[in-house]
Amino acid sequence: MKIANECVVNIEYTLRDDTGEIIDSSDVMGALEYVQGHGMIIPGLETALINREEGEEFSVTIPPVGAYGEVQEDLRMTVGRDQFPPNVPIEVGMRFDAGSGGDSRPVTVTDVQGETIIVDGNHPLAGKTLHFEVAVRSVREATDDDLAALLFRESTSGGGCGSGAGGCGSCGAGCH
């Protein structure tokens, strides 16, 4: 069965940076299961998985545009210490949600200069080329229950069906 939209796919992977250092691996968190075509994984990897089959192993290099994008300088900001919880010591590497209400974004503290804190709203892997080694462990057609759970997840996380790529229903093509 080939991977196509509306398939539930289970993969094992190792992710490395340009130096060969392991950034992430399914050895740590277990195999990754996702529904193809719903933007649950980075676009470059999702595209590389199309038409792959159970048991297939491959390597793929994903440039920043297919992963977490280029670094956006306007997401690096200087803020006052008073913008953080008063009883929490602020240290480089800490992550906070910045913003108010439902419009928040995770930021990472990159520098602390007394009462001035430098934060970065870019994803930690923004601007990086990613190197994946992938093993496709299973592929099956998504059931109605799989899709219902996915729609519930998207509606509670603020994500859109198919990441704006179309409707929520089955594409009709199924897994091949």
UniProtKB/Swiss-Prot annotation:
Span of domain PPIase FKBP-type: 1-95
Family stated for the protein in its record: Belongs to the FKBP-type PPIase family.
GO molecular function: metal ion binding; peptidyl-prolyl cis-trans isomerase activity
Pfam families in UniProt: FKBP_C (PF00254)
GO biological process entries: protein refolding
Protein's UniProt name: FKBP-type peptidyl-prolyl cis-trans isomerase SlyD
Gene that encodes the chain: slyD
Keywords of the record: Chaperone, Cytoplasm, Isomerase, Metal-binding, Nickel, Rotamase
Span list, region IF-chaperone: 76-120
Location of the region described as PPIase first part in the Swiss-Prot/TrEMBL record: 1-69
Annotated source species: Treponema pallidum (strain Nichols)
Subcellular localization(s) per the UniProt record: Cytoplasm
